[in-house]
Amino acid sequence: MAFEFRLPDIGEGIHEGEIVKWFVKAGDTIEEDDVLAEVQNDKSVVEIPSPVSGTVEEVMVEEGTVAVVGDVIVKIDAPDAEDMQFKGHDDDSSSKEEPAKEEAPAEQAPVATQTEEVDENRTVKAMPSVRKYAREKGVNIKAVSGSGKNGRITKEDVDAYLNGGAPTASNESADSATNEEVAETPAAPAAVSLEGDFPETTEKIPAMRRAIAKAMVNSKHTAPHVTLMDEIDVQALWDHRKKFKEIAAEQGTKLTFLPYVVKALVSALKKYPALNTSFNEEAGEIVHKHYWNIGIAADTDRGLLVPVVKHADRKSIFQISDEINELAVKARDGKLTADEMKGATCTISNIGSAGGQWFTPVINHPEVAILGIGRIAQKPIVKDGEIVAAPVLALSLSFDHRQIDGATGQNAMNHIKRLLNNPELLLMEG
C-alpha cells in the first residue's frame, strides 16, 4: 500500500484549506521536507512539506479544490512510512479499541449503536479533537452523521448522536438524500430559456473571499460602527517627505506618507487607549493592549490582506516604511505567513491609493477602530485670511460605539490631524 498523506492541521484554528498550487505530479521522486503544495488557509498561503521520501503515485485533490483537515491529498510510494501517523490523521482503529474498554450502562445511547450496522469503510471527516471526543464518549465516529461543511463531523454531532438525534450515517439516509436532490433538479431547466437574453456564469467562492466575507459580516453584526470624516492641510507633511525622500532613497528606502500616518495613529492610541482595546461582550471583559501593532490593509489580486507592523511604537519612520514595502510585496506574491497577519491592535485602510477620499471602513474585529486615509488633493483653504491652494488629506475613522464614545473618537481624530499638520511634532510627541 502507498502512504496516504492527509492534509495536516496547520494551526490558527483553520479546519480546511484550498489547494492553490501543486509542485509535484504522479511519477515525481521526492525527498523528505520537499514542498508538495501551497494551501490557502484563511488569508495566508502555507507551503506543505512532504513528511517522507518516495515517489508520488497520485495527486488526489486538484488545484482550486478545498480540502478538509484529514483528507487524503496525495499518495506516495514510501514503503517504510506506510504506518506513520501525523497530526490531522487519526488512526480509526483506536476509535474501535478504546470504546471496548468502557462498559457503558444499558440506558446509554452508545450501547444501542453496537447493534447498528455501520459502514466501516466509510470515509470520516473530523478534526482530531472531535475523534478523541467521540472515543471518550464511547462513540464509533463512523456511525455519526456530519452536519459541518463537506459532511465534517463536529462535537455537536457526537452529542446529538448520544442524545438519539440523527443516529447513523446509513446508506438508506444517503440514498434518500440523493433521491430528494434528484427530485428537485427538474426545476433547473426552466432557466435555460433565458440564457440567450440574460447569460450568467457561476464560480466557486475562493477560500480568501469566503474568509473576507466572514470577517466583514462578523464585524458589522457584532460592532455598532460610527464613522467620523475630516480633512487636514498637509503642506508641511508634503514638504517634510520631499526633504527626506532622497536621503531615504540613498538608504534603499522608498518613503511614502503612510509611515507618518502609522506614527500619528500610534501616538493617538497611546493618548486615547480606549482605541487600543478589544471589547469581549461574551466574557464581560475589556482587553487593554499594552503594545501597538498596526495592520495595513493591502489590496491584492486575490483579495484584501492585512499584514501587521509589530511594535510600531519602537520603529523609526524609515524602518516602518521598509517594513510596509516588504509586507506589500509579500502580500502581492501570496507569501505572507499567518504570523505576519495577526496581532494587530488597530488597522489603517488606504483608499487613497485607489483615488478615493472619504469612506466608511469596516473595523477589523476584534479591534475597536480603523483609520481610513484618502487621497491627497489640492484644495482651496483659508490661511491667514487668504484663500490659497494646499494639499489636503481626507481621513475617516470608524470605531466600535460599544467601547468608544463619539467625543473620544473625535479627540483621537483631532490628535492625528494635529500631528500630520506639523510632522515635526511626531519627534516631540509621537
Swiss-Prot record:
Q: Known catalysed reaction(s)?
A: N(6)-[(R)-dihydrolipoyl]-L-lysyl-[protein] + acetyl-CoA = N(6)-[(R)-S(8)-acetyldihydrolipoyl]-L-lysyl-[protein] + CoA
Q: Which GO terms describe its molecular function?
A: dihydrolipoyllysine-residue acetyltransferase activity; lipoic acid binding
User: Which terms are listed as keywords in the entry?
Assistant: Acyltransferase, Lipoyl, Transferase
Q: Which residues form the Lipoyl-binding domain?
A: 2-77
* Keyword Transferase recorded: yes
Q: Which residues carry this modification: N6-lipoyllysine?
A: 43
Q: Which cofactor does it need?
A: (R)-lipoate
* Biased composition range(s): Low complexity: 177-192
* A GO cellular component entry from the record: cytoplasm
Q: Where is the active site?
A: 401
* UniProt key word NADP: no
Coiled-coil spans in chain: none
Sequence ranges assigned to domain Peripheral subunit-binding (PSBD) in this UniProt record: 125-162
Q: Where is this region: Disordered?
A: 80-122, 164-200
Looking up InterPro entries in the UniProt record yields:
2-oxoA_DH_lipoyl-BS, 2-oxoacid_DH_actylTfrase, 2-oxoacid_DH_E2_comp, Biotin_lipoyl, CAT-like_dom_sf, E3-bd_dom_sf, PSBD, Single_hybrid_motif
| EC numbers for this chain | 2.3.1.12
| Cofactor, free-text remark | Binds 1 lipoyl cofactor covalently.
Q: Where is the composition biased (Basic and acidic residues)?
A: 84-104
- Function description: The pyruvate dehydrogenase complex catalyzes the overall conversion of pyruvate to acetyl-CoA and CO(2). It contains multiple copies of three enzymatic components: pyruvate dehydrogenase (E1), dihydrolipoamide acetyltransferase (E2) and lipoamide dehydrogenase (E3).
The record's note on quaternary structure and interaction partners says: Forms a 24-polypeptide structural core with octahedral symmetry.
Task: Tell me its family.
Answer: Belongs to the 2-oxoacid dehydrogenase family.
Identification of the protein by name: Dihydrolipoyllysine-residue acetyltransferase component of pyruvate dehydrogenase complex
Encoding gene (name): pdhC
